[in-house]
Amino acid sequence: MVLNFRDKSCIFLAILCCLSLSCIVKASVSYDRKAVIINGQRRILLSGSIHYPRSTPEMWPGLIQKAKEGGLDVIETYVFWNGHEPSPGQYYFGDRYDLVKFIKLVHQAGLYVNLRIGPYVCAEWNFGGFPVWLKFVPGMAFRTDNEPFKAAMKKFTEKIVWMMKAEKLFQTQGGPIILAQIENEYGPVEWEIGAPGKAYTKWVAQMALGLSTGVPWIMCKQEDAPGPIIDTCNGYYCEDFKPNSINKPKMWTENWTGWYTDFGGAVPYRPVEDIAYSVARFIQKGGSLVNYYMYHGGTNFDRTAGEFMASSYDYDAPLDEYGLPREPKYSHLKALHKAIKLSEPALLSADATVTSLGAKQEAYVFWSKSSCAAFLSNKDENSAARVLFRGFPYDLPPWSVSILPDCKTEVYNTAKVNAPSVHRNMVPTGTKFSWGSFNEATPTANEAGTFARNGLVEQISMTWDKSDYFWYITDITIGSGETFLKTGDSPLLTVMSAGHALHVFVNGQLSGTAYGGLDHPKLTFSQKIKLHAGVNKIALLSVAVGLPNVGTHFEQWNKGVLGPVTLKGVNSGTWDMSKWKWSYKIGVKGEALSLHTNTESSGVRWTQGSFVAKKQPLTWYKSTFATPAGNEPLALDMNTMGKGQVWINGRNIGRHWPAYKAQGSCGRCNYAGTFDAKKCLSNCGEASQRWYHVPRSWLKSQNLIVVFEELGGDPNGISLVKRT
């Protein structure tokens, strides 16, 4: 048959149409009761959380590649509002906050993205990711049916979605984003506040759906997630979780691979056998997406850590704080992922047939026309079991699952760890520091930069969280006839504070310190102080250690000295100083002088050599050092210091607080049995955090290190180490 030009043109157009339709089909994300469907295909999705601001852009490619090599399909991240909009309408998407770059790197690696926009994140992040300025918007009430909050939240959410669309990053545009999350763990808050919470849930769902991303929206810990939005599970175990509709897939957005470290707390860890067991149990009971929170935890640089959170956000993740594989956790989970993928055709084609193999043992068998997979489970915490399945014996350790991708061959058991353990060491680099020091004087009531008020003021309303530090200053005049001057029985100063730490200076000398903790952020300082006849200078340095990241009514949270403040033991009994006239000052002097940078004020004289201050409060230290050879990750050993902050070449590597020793019960930990954050602990009696990550990408050939020490420490004990 001979085709004329018109026939050929019609065929060519038909082919183009088919190709176009094919592209449309391929660029699609939907779901059914079994799984997320990408490009028309159901998928078992293995995911890991990597938060872009908690590492450096130079680290991102390596982290993403290791995640891919570890068997992951998806990278999950929050979006950090306070990092992106530090002032109203002023946006920042550079350096560690270059969200677009991060997502494009994930795409280049061939992985997908679950973008948890929130924009509330919790995440042990300062103020839960909210910008502090939001607290002071008139009429503001957080995360409820409140117009000022909804307007701000909608504006930022739209900003992020439009940015993703402009860069063509949603899967329907050919990008990697296959899921997006609105809000975050809101169910408990909704339950607590009632009707306004329910109204807010409906509003936020409709707002998100109206943005037309082309990919499914999810809400975690949200049993009443409306309509097409998928409700998902967070926790150590989610095997028994069920979504609120039989038409939605069973998804796990946070499988906690460990837990956070707070100052004053021991360091938690979670045995990999238990993580693998939890994943296998979830998959055998119909789960189709598992996300490890965290896969790489990273570092809380700057002042981004939440209330009392350590600068390290290592989380006992498969990739440690420095980006190195944690073994055997990384490799044992990699083997799990391979076994699950071998079973994927059967898992997604059929529902499980469950058969008892013993009192606490059972088989989950998935049949399809072309495949069969079985999960053999032993729920017994104490005893191993030999079971018969299809006429063959299988040995199941306690609290374990064996995976048989062909219903015959055991390729993996969650408790049989074949990967070798690797112990990481912190090895001194031999770097020598030659310290200079500068001691701050305590401010006085009438000096420059102070302002006065009658009574006590709340700290964050004054600082707007631009500094951790806020001074409360007053004078106490003691008459010569006061009895305590003769008896030597000094009066008792009592200061009640909403947190987090308080340094009390009397006549320029540190009289004492008090601090709270994560479970009890409020504090009371109560100590006898030495006063003389005449005017005595009282300076209270109130210190915030991050802002709370979880709870309700963010707009009502307070910090600082709110009183009462009393002096007991004077002739007239007790003085209530709470309503006295107080002077206030935001920040410490060194911050105002930018001592952490190379552009410091020339008016500062640094003490050198043998005159360098040791064990003195309010002391700044600086030195220079050369970058060590090699490519091993670097850290500072700060074990001889007390509390403060550290800068490298003007960049803040986080708060240090080695003086706060870890409380808790450390000892042997059995993987078997239900895990919680207190079960497996290390570091008891030692500093909650000793080593502080120094990113190599922040270094030059010669570098400046600056330390601000609040309590007093010995800088000669600081050393630069490499992680090997």
From Swiss-Prot:
What tissues has this protein been observed in? Ubiquitous, with higher expression levels in roots and siliques.
Please tell me which top-level EC class this enzyme sits in.
hydrolase
Query: What is catalyzed by this enzyme?
Result: Hydrolysis of terminal non-reducing beta-D-galactose residues in beta-D-galactosides
Gene3D superfamilies, A to Z:
Galactose-binding domain-like (2.60.120.260), Glycosidases (3.20.20.80)
Superkingdom of the source species: Eukaryota
Which residue positions does the secretion signal occupy?
1-27
One GO molecular function term? beta-galactosidase activity
PROSITE patterns found in the cross-reference section: GLYCOSYL_HYDROL_F35
Q: Which residues form a coiled coil?
A: none
Q: Which GO terms describe its biological process?
A: carbohydrate metabolic process
Where, per UniProt, does this protein localize? Secreted, Extracellular space, Apoplast
| Positions annotated with a glycan in the UniProt record | N255
Annotated keywords: Apoplast, Glycoprotein, Glycosidase, Hydrolase, Secreted, Signal
Keyword field contains Secreted: yes
Q: Does the keyword Nucleus apply?
A: no
InterPro entries with a match to the protein in the record: BetaGal_gal-bd, Galactose-bd-like_sf, GHD, Gly_Hdrlase_35_cat, Glyco_hydro_35_CS, Glycoside_Hdrlase_35, Glycoside_hydrolase_SF
Please report what switches on or represses expression of this protein: By sugar starvation and exposure to darkness for 24 hours.
Annotated active site: E185 (proton donor), E254 (nucleophile)
**What's in the GO CC field?**
apoplast; plastid
Q: Which E.C. number(s) belong to this protein?
A: 3.2.1.23
Q: Which Pfam families does this entry report, sorted A to Z?
A: BetaGal_gal-bd, GHD, Glyco_hydro_35
Predominant location of this chain? secreted
Q: What does this protein do?
A: Preferentially hydrolyzes para-nitrophenyl-beta-D-galactoside. Can hydrolyze para-nitrophenyl-beta-D-fucoside with 5 time less efficiency.
Q: Report the sequence similarity comment from the record.
A: Belongs to the glycosyl hydrolase 35 family.
Q: What is this protein called?
A: Beta-galactosidase 4
Task: Give the gene symbol.
Answer: BGAL4
